[in-house]
Amino acid sequence: MKYLILAEKPSVARDIADALQINQKRNGYFENNQYIVTWALGHLVTNATPEQYDKNLKEWRLEDLPIIPKYMKTVVIGKTSKQFKTVKALILDNKVKDIIIATDAGREGELVARLILDKVGNKKPLRRLWISSVTKKAIQQSFKNLKDGRQYNDLYYAALARSEADWIVGINATRALTTKYDAQLSLGRVQTPTIQLVNTRQQEINQFKPQQYYTLSLTVKGFDFQLESNQRYTNKETLEQIVNNLKNVDGKIKSVATKHKKSYPQSLYNLTDLQQDMYRRYKIGPKETLNTLQSLYERHKVVTYPRTDSNYLTTDMVDTMKERIQATMATTYKDQARPLISKTFSSKMSIFNNQKVSDHHAIIPTEVRPVMSDLSNRELKLYDMIVERFLEALMPPHEYDAITVTLEVAGHTFVLKENVTTVLGFKSIRQGESITEMQQPFSEGDEVKISKTNIREHETTPPEYFNEGSLLKAMENPQNFIQLKDKKYAQTLKQTGGIGTVATRADIIDKLFNMNAIESRDGKIKVTSKGKQILELAPEELTSPLLTAQWEEKLLLIERGKYQAKTFINEMKGFTKDVVNGIKNSDRKYKHDNLTTTECPTCGKFMIKVKTKNGQMLVCQDPSCKTKKNVQRKTNARCPNCKKKLTLFGKGKEAVYRCVCGHSETQAHMDQRMKSKSSGKVSRKEMKKYMNKNEGLDNNPFKDALKNLNL
């Protein structure tokens, strides 16, 4: 008898097979005398579409809504049906005794496996492999601690409830809005509140009125003393009167106080923090960061599980620190890492906290030492950030003296504050940090002369527009960005992790860009006309982050066995009926403000121009037509004059590449330029691959052919 191991992806299945010495490669699985390991390809089974319940529902009609099946159906995904048949045969194989679920350790990973098992009709016992890294050592250790699969039943019920609720609400709200207003409009319990977040910030900026205020400082022996006051002076004359009082008056040092202080490193990275920092440092979007992180985790095996919301480690990981530090010796931080190898770490350190780790701990390096030359430029940047944060967390605190000098002049108090670094601690890892010395020349009781007075004018500034990094953080903590009627709602949002999950937020932002609900201009995310109209047309409940937080709260209760999934689904059905009725009875109108005179080549209706993340495209206004064509898009081809990225207009032989500097060239010229700078022939297919790549050519099968290009 054998154990069947079900992984989520082929790469993880290979890692498990390697760790357990399962060496016989079959068609769709690996095998030895004890184990069979196979894989899903993400989801192999999904919720049925409305037309799979009733073929008459293929056409979208408002009168057919709401669509609420009595029992939810699942179907095998067509493009991966071959692998499903392989997995099904293995599950039903009489040689298989138990099944070990080895999909991603989390709600969605559980759903991937259980939908397959339910579709097959599995009756065999289940075990659960729960891992946070796919290194050989981690896999072998986790196989010694397999859990009874029944312990994760509630996790599955929560995942299934989430999936079914999103289907019921999303399908009906989207079809209702689209058919009511004859436009491609989409609603969702996560995406719509996210549009509202962006819109709220945009309104705050538009309504902001700057105010002028003034500050006063004195210069004494080259040091600037600030007027000590909690008041913001909006009347310049008040400060001018103080300056007049100070003329020909000496000051007296009232006190010189020194307080020794410590500062501590930032928390270890969770996914959201890492995505935010990658955007802040390198302008790399959340989706791209997650994809790169997934590569570091699955392919290179140098970091732990990416989709985590925790900033902490569990206490049983203390003894693994030395191996992880040794792995970082391959990086530019080796000089800072070396002293830490001999250090003894304690579970009492602040980074270790079992109560603050749920499914997965913070993102840190594994014990696998990377081959730095194998990492792409983006992978290097990301890995370096993780290593930097990890090493900082293990280093001593930064220590400094906070010096406060108080000056009294004509009854007014002025203050000088300076920090003097005494111990670099974790800041030694940062370039430019050093021990500082302040030779402040003041002693208590000194009489001093004022060499200069300075009245400075300031202006209040509006909040900043969200960018892709800060929007992620806002989705995680929406209570900090919206007004709520009751403080308990803010607590609900905080406890449930806000809008979406750490694993889905990047996809949601990407989806909103693609559906033209939001756009980014110079890194500033704004709501489009379409996005604003969606908010106006959508039921108010669906625009609030509070609703999704309340749902998430119930899903967490289901996960803990404290709420019935059936009750939750019934609530969602009732909510959906109200949403559909509200849309049906609405007298509002939707206006296409981006309608063009270009006819759709498929149905003849006029097309609408929409902005995408990387350019513009024309989309048929008829939701059932789905015809699209690119108008322009950014490429990775470089201008030969200014080296900026070129924008592609048109397609095929008529395509033209243009640059902001004024340079332009035809497709034929671009092909010729590539060939002249390459050692070999470059096909149109290869050219297209090059244009579509988000990163360099490191992992491109045409790397050798294109390595001499200077585009």
Swiss-Prot record:
One of its GO terms (cellular component) is cytoplasmic replication fork. SMART domains: TOP1Ac, TOP1Bc, TOPRIM. Signal peptide: none annotated. CDD domains: TOP1Ac, TOPRIM_TopoIA_TopoIII. One of its GO terms (biological process) is DNA repair. Gene3D superfamilies: 3.40.50.140, Topoisomerase I, domain 2 (1.10.460.10), Topoisomerase I, domain 3 (2.70.20.10), Topoisomerase I, domain 4 (1.10.290.10). Its cofactor is Mg(2+). It catalyses: ATP-independent breakage of single-stranded DNA, followed by passage and rejoining. Keywords: DNA-binding, Isomerase, Magnesium, Metal-binding, Topoisomerase. The record marks 60, 167, 175, 307 as: Interaction with DNA. Residues 691-711 are annotated as: Disordered. Residues 186-191 are annotated as: Interaction with DNA. Residues 152-580 form the Topo IA-type catalytic domain. Releases the supercoiling and torsional tension of DNA, which is introduced during the DNA replication and transcription, by transiently cleaving and rejoining one strand of the DNA duplex. Introduces a single-strand break via transesterification at a target site in duplex DNA. The scissile phosphodiester is attacked by the catalytic tyrosine of the enzyme, resulting in the formation of a DNA-(5'-phosphotyrosyl)-enzyme intermediate and the expulsion of a 3'-OH DNA strand. The free DNA strand then undergoes passage around the unbroken strand, thus removing DNA supercoils. This is Putative DNA topoisomerase 3. The lineage of its organism: Bacteria, Bacillati, Bacillota, Bacilli, Bacillales.
